[in-house]
């Protein structure tokens, strides 16, 4: 077996092992919260940095288009990472730590949901957003590493993966967000 094949096998084996550690009860709670938000016409907001920002954006596409198109009940979801003009305006004029919390102030109302995604669980802008959301009556969901940093501690619901390997972590985040989306896309009772 060549080195590349060995790497591929090991990567797949570790990904498989990590998927077995995901918490079905916690993911089911997140599904329930999303369903309640849709039924009450509440906003679901998502944020992250770097690869986590792209995961937040992809989740919005799957929910807003995939789980809403052609259905009577529609989700209202927005990624706080998608307007580069807004993000850079706050980063330049206020601070990078405030790029999400300042946007949240426009959307915060009790019953809305904030989904925050962070590999380290310690990104200052993510933590400020969660703290503000908690104080404003939003439900908060954190996707992070098993060690979780502060995000794991301050999120009302934590969906964690026990690894610090960013590739495996992001693979698992994508899988969890796809579960959260596809349960609505493929199941008409939802």
What do these predicted regions represent?
Residues 1-21:
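Generic N-terminal amphipathic, Lys/Arg-enriched alpha-helix
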Residues 22-40:
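A short, well-structured juxtamembrane/interface segment
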Residues 36-108:
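Glycine-rich, small/polar surface segments that engage phosphate groups of diverse ligands
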Residues 52-57, 122-129, 151:
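Short glycine/serine/threonine-rich phosphate/pyrophosphate-binding segments
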Residues 81, 118, 144, 159-167:
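Short beta->alpha connector loops at strand-helix junctions that form conserved
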Residues 106, 167-190:
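A charged, well-structured terminal subsegment
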Residues 143-155:
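Short, glycine/polar-rich helix-capping loops at beta-to-alpha or helix-loop-helix junctions
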């Amino acid at each position: 077996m060549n080195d590349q094949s060995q790497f591929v096998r090991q990567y797949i084996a570790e990904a498989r092992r990590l998927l077995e550690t995901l918490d079905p009860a916690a993911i089911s709670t997140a599904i329930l919260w999303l369903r309640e938000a849709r039924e009450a016409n509440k906003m679901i907001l998502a944020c992250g940095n770097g690869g986590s920002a792209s995961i937040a954006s992809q989740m919005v596409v799957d929910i807003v288009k995939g789980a809403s198109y052609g259905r009577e009940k529609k989700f209202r979801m927005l990624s706080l990472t998608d307007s580069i003009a807004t993000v850079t305006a706050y980063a330049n004029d206020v601070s990078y730590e405030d790029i999400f919390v300042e946007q949240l102030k426009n959307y915060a109302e009790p019953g809305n949901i904030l989904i925050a995604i962070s590999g380290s669980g310690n990104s200052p802008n993510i933590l400020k957003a969660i703290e503000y959301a908690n104080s404003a009556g939003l439900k908060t969901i954190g996707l992070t590493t098993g060690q979780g940093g502060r995000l794991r501690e301050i999120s009302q619901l934590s969906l964690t993966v026990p690894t610090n390997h960013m590739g495996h972590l992001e693979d698992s985040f994508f899988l969890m967000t796809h579960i959260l989306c596809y349960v609505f896309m493929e199941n008409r009772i939802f």
